[in-house]
Amino acid sequence: MIENWPKKPEGSQWTDDQWKAVVANGRDILVAAAAGSGKTAVLVERIIKKIINEENPVDVDRLLVVTFTNAAAQEMKNRIGEALEKVLIDEPGSQHVRKQLSLLNKASISTIHSFCLQVIRGYYYMLDVDPRFRIANQTENELLKEEVLDDILEEEYGIEDNTIFFELVDRYTSDRSDDDLQRMILALHTESRAHPNPEKWLDKLVEAYDVEGKTIEDLVYASYLLEDVKFQLETAEQHIRKATELAMLPDGPAPRIETLQADLALLGTLSSAAHESWTSLYEAMQNVSWQTLKRIKKSDYNEDVVKQVDSLRNKAKDEVKKLQEELFSRKPESFLRDFQDMHPVLEKLVQLVKVFTERFQAMKRDKGMVDFTDLEHFCLQILSEQSENGEMNPSAVALQYRNKFAEVLVDEYQDTNFVQESIIKFVTKDSESEGNLFMVGDVKQSIYRFRLAEPGLFLGKYKRFTQEGLGGGMKIDLAKNFRSRHEVLAGTNFIFKQIMGEEVGEIDYDADAELKLGATYPEGEDVAAELLCIQQTEEEVIDGEEGAEVEKAQLEARLMAQRIKAMVDSGYEVYDRKNDSMRPVQYRDFVILLRSMPWAPQIMEELKLQGIPVYADLATGYFEATEVNIMMNVFRVIDNPMQDIPLAAVLRSPIVGLSDEELATLRAHGKKGSFYEVMSSFLKGAPLEEEQELHDKLEWFYNLLQGWREFARQQSLSDLIWKVYGETGYYDFVGGLPAGKQRQANLRVLYDRARQYEATSFRGLFRFLRFIERILERGDDMGTARALGEQEDVVRIMTIHKSKGLEFPVVFVAGLGRRFNTQDLMKRFLLHKDFGFGSQFIDPRKRIKYTTLSQLAIKRKMKMELIAEEMRVLYVALTRAKEKLILIGTVKDANKEMEKWLDAREHSEWLLPDHIRAGASCYLDWIAPSLYRHRDSEMLLELGQGSIPDEIYGYDTSWKVEVVDGNTLLAPEPVQEEKQELLEALREKKAVPLESERKDEVYDRLMWKYGYEEATSHRAKQSVTEIKRNYQSEDGSDNAFIKKLRAPIKTRPRFMEKKGLTYAERGTAVHAVMQHVDLKKPITVEVLQEQIAGMVNKELLTFEQAEEIAIEKVISFFDSDLGKKVLAAKSVEREVPFTMMLAAEEAYQDWQGNSGESILVQGVIDCMIEEEDGITLIDFKTDTIEGKFPGGFEQAKPILEDRYKVQLSLYAKALEKSLQHPVKEKCLYFFDGNHVVNIEE
C-alpha cells in the first residue's frame, strides 16, 4: 500500500516526512510534530489532497476535523477555502471544487465540543434533554452545585442513626464548617466526569479500599511506592559512591573509605529487599545500622573535601531515614487496617457524590441547560451502548458516523482527554492497522493536565505505532523546525537532552524528538541564547515571602527593561521574512513569558518607567478598580444597608462625599447600632447649624437609597445599575478622571455582567452579589478595560500557556527562579485518575491523624506528573523564540545555588541523574546544571572541562551565562535621584536653586503661552446649522460649546410633560417623507398615505410622526413650480451629506487667532437638481410663517433670507468644491404657506 502513495513532486517545498504525513493512508497515523514544524500546513494540505484526489475524491463534509479552539477551526476553514480557490484559478471549470467550496461552511471542522453539540442537536430525542437547551455560564454552574449540595447535606444531617455519614463529617470537617467535605464531593464529581464511565470510576475507588483477604503486596499503592523506594535508594547509593571517589583523592580522607564501603553494602541489602517485596524491605529497614565514622585529624586532609564527603554521607542517611519514617515505621498489617477502617466512610462519600451528580443533572435538565462536560457525556451516550458484560460498544448512530466519515483528523491530539478519546474511537474504524484516524500533535507541548488532558494517550500510541506502520498504526516524526535560528534550537536541544527522560519527564528526548533546523536566516550579531541569573543579596531581601517575590519581580523587570531599551536604541536587527532583509527591532518584536501573571503588574510598571510601551492581558484587577469597588459597595448597601463597611465606603466615596470628620460626626450621634440606623436617626432630628451641610448630603443619599431599594424589588438588575449611574452622575464623574475612558468602560462591563447574569436562571440583586463573590472565590477576576490594543507597537507580557502556538523574534522567559506551584500536593485529600482517593487517616475518637499509603502514593505520582508537566511548559516557552532567547531567574544566594548545580558536572551521561531532575523546585534547577556542563559557562565558572564528555562540553550551541548583581539593578539612576531631591525640597516649600544646565529651558516652559489659545474656545468641527447660529449670535462666540460645561437644568418628570411631538421631531418627519417619497409615482393623497404607511413599517417613521404629517402641504410643494421642476428633472439627489474644510475666520465672526487655522464642517443638503448649466439647491423649512409676522410674508422674507443665507452659501460652496459644477440657484421652500425664497449673494 505504501508503494501506491503519490511520489513527492520535483522541487516540492515539503520535506520527506511532511510529504509522508500529507499522503500516507490506510491505517491510523500519529504525527509527532515538533514546535514550528508546519503541522497546520501539513494538515491543510492533507485535507486538500483528499478533496481533489483524481482517483478517489472525498467531499469535505465527509471529513471530521477536530481542533483545540474555535479560532483554530475558523483558521483551518479559511486556509482550506483559500487553497480551494487557488485550485479553482488553475481549474476554473471544476464543478467538484466549486461544490467543495459550497460545502465548506457545513463541514465538520470544529472543536470536539462543537461536534458533540452537533450530534446532540441531531439525536436529542435519544436523551432526556430539552432540545432548546443552552450552555450554562460557569459561575451559574457553580452556584447551582452549591445549591444542590446544600440541600443534600441538609437532608443527611436530618436523618437519624446516620452513623457512617457523621463519621465522615467528623473525619473530614472542622468544628466550624463542612467546607472540606463539600470540596471533596465536588472534586470527586469533577474528576469522575473526566472518565467515560463516571460511576464505574467511582466504584473502583471504593473497591481499592476493600482489602479483605489481601496482603500489602496486592495493593497498587505499595507496588508504585516500591518503585519510588528503589529510586531513592539508588540516589543514596550515588551519594555514597561520590563520597568514596572524593575520599580516594590524594588529599581526601582515606580513613572514611572503609565506612563508606560498609554503607554501600547496607544500601545494597536494602535495594535487594526492595526488589523482593514490601515485607522483605520492612524487615530489612528494622535492622538498619550505620557505622560510626572514625575520628580523623582534619588538618591532615583537605578540609573542603572532608566536608563534602561527610555532607554526601549525611544526604544518603537522610534518604534512608525519610523512608523509614514515612513508610517503614509501621507494620504492613497496620496499613491494611487503615484501608479497611476507611472503606465504609469512603463508600458513603462516593454515595453522596452519586446522589449529587444525579440531582445536579436533574436541576440542569429542569432549567434547560447543559455544561461542557454534559456535551461530551451526552454525545458519548448517543454514540455508545452497553453490552451485557458492561463493555461500551458503538451504537447504530456511531456506525452511521463511521460510514459517513472517510477520515477523522484530530489536531493537538496531546491535549485530548479520556472521554474525548472514546468519542473519537466510536466514529472511527476499530482496527488501527486499517484505521482512518489521523492525529497530529506534540506531546512535549502537552501543558493542559489541569484541564484533565491526558498526554498518556499520545505517548501510548507513539510507543505502540511504528514508522513503517506494520501490524498496527504508523507514526511520523516532523522534527524540522521552520521557525527559529540554529542558536535557539541548539540551545533548547542542549537543555532538554539533559533533563527530559521517560522516568522523570515521561518522554525520552532522543534523536527523533530533537529539534532540527529547517529555517534559513542571514548571519546575525548577538544571537547567542542567554541565561542571566540575578543575585539577590541579603540587604535587598524584604521581610516575608511576598515581599521577596515583589523584589525579585522588580529586579528582573529592571534588567529586562534595560536590555529592551538597549536593543532598540542600538538598532539591534531581526530578520523580516516578507521583505527578505534585516530591519531594526521594534517593541512589538519582544515578548516576556511568565509561568503565571502575578508579576505582570510590577513588570509593566517598570517598563513604563523606562518609557517602554507594554501590553498585558491581565485577567485580574477589575473588581479592585476603584470605580467598580465603589459601585459594588453601593449595590451591597441597596441589598442590605445594615452592612457598615460597604455603607461607610459609599459615604466616603465621591458619590456622597463625606470627609473623615463628617463620618466621625455622624458616628458620634450614635455609638451603638449600625451606620444606617445612626444615619436614619440623625436625619429625623433638626441639625445644628454647623451640621446642615452634612444633613443635606445624607438626606440626598438617603432618599436615593430608598428609591433604589424599591426599584430593585420591581425592576431588572441592569436597569437598576444604569439608574444608579445616572442619578448619582458617577458614570460621568469617572469619565473626567485620569484614564476616564477606561473607568467608564469598567462600569459598562459591570452593566454587561449584570445582563449576562440575568440571562441565567438566577434573578435579583442578592443572588447577583453572590454570583460576583463566587467569581472572586474562584479567582476569576476579570481584567480592566484595555488601554492598548494587541496590534500596537508594544512589548507583550503573557503566560507561557497563552503563548502556545505563537512566535516572536526576541523572547524573554522570566521568573525562572520561582518555585513550582505544589499547593495541590498539600491538600487534605488527593485524587488521581489511576490511584483514586487518598487522604490522611483520621481517628476523631483518639484525636490522631497520620499519612496513609494511598496518600503517599498519589502524592508521589502527582509530584512526578507535575515535574513532567513543568518540563513541557519550559519546552513551550523556549520554542517561542525565532531569533533571540533570553532566560532570566533570581536566586537569594547564587554561590549556594551554584554549589548545588555544579554536582551535575560530575555526571558523564547526557541525561542528568534522576534525583537532580526530580528534585528540582524551579526551572533554574534544570537550566543551570545543564549549562554548567557547556564550555560557554567557563567565563563564569573557570573550572575547565573536568570529566565532562566532549560531546556535551563542546556541543554546537552558543550561550552567554552571567550572574548579575542585584545591587547594580536597584541603584537609583542619577536623574531619578536628582528628581527625588527636588520633589522633597518642593514638598517642604524650600526655595529650589536652578543650577541645572537646562534652567533657560525650564524658565521658557514656565513662561510659555499656548499659541492657539483662540482655538480652545471654538470647536474644530462644526455643523452648518451651528455656524448659522454662530453668525446670528451677538458676539459670534460658540455658546453651544460653553453651554455643555454648564450645570444642566432638571427636566420635568415624564408624567408632567405634555404629550406630542416637538417642533424638531415634526421637522424631522417631514424631511424623512421628502427624502423617501417616490418621484416616479403620481403625487396624490392615497399614494402618499400608502408610502408613509410603508415608512412606518420599515421603522423610518414612528406612528406618532406619521400622524403629524400634513399630506396636503407635501402635495402643495409638488404642485408649485419648484416642485414640478423636481418631478421633471433627470437628476435629483436628496439628503446629500458632505464634509469640507473651512477657514476658521469664515466660520467664526469673532475669530482672532491664526489665519491658517481650519475647521471641519459637516452638513446634509435636502435636495439638489443637477442640470447642464448648473445646480439648483433646495432646502426644506418647517418654520411657522403664517400669523407670526404682522406684515405677512413680505415682512418675513428679508428676515428669513438673512437667517438662512450663511447656511445655503456653505451648501453651495460644498457642492461646487466636490462636483466642480456651479450652483445657479439657491432656494428655501417653506411648507407653512407654500412660499419659495431665492437666496442671492
UniProtKB/Swiss-Prot annotation:
SUPFAM superfamilies: P-loop containing nucleoside triphosphate hydrolases, Restriction endonuclease-like. It catalyses: Couples ATP hydrolysis with the unwinding of duplex DNA by translocating in the 3'-5' direction; ATP + H2O = ADP + phosphate + H(+). It holds the Pfam family UvrD-helicase. CDD domains: SF1_C_UvrD. GO terms for molecular function: 3'-5' DNA helicase activity; 3'-5' exonuclease activity; ATP binding; ATP hydrolysis activity; double-stranded DNA binding. Its EC number is 3.1.-.-, 5.6.2.4. GO terms for cellular component: cytosol; DNA helicase complex. Residues 12-485 form the UvrD-like helicase ATP-binding domain. Its cofactor is Mg(2+). Coiled coil: none annotated. ATP binds at A33, A34, A35, G36, S37, G38, K39, T40. Belongs to the helicase family. AddA subfamily. This is ATP-dependent helicase/nuclease subunit A. It comes from Bacillus cereus (strain B4264). The gene is addA.
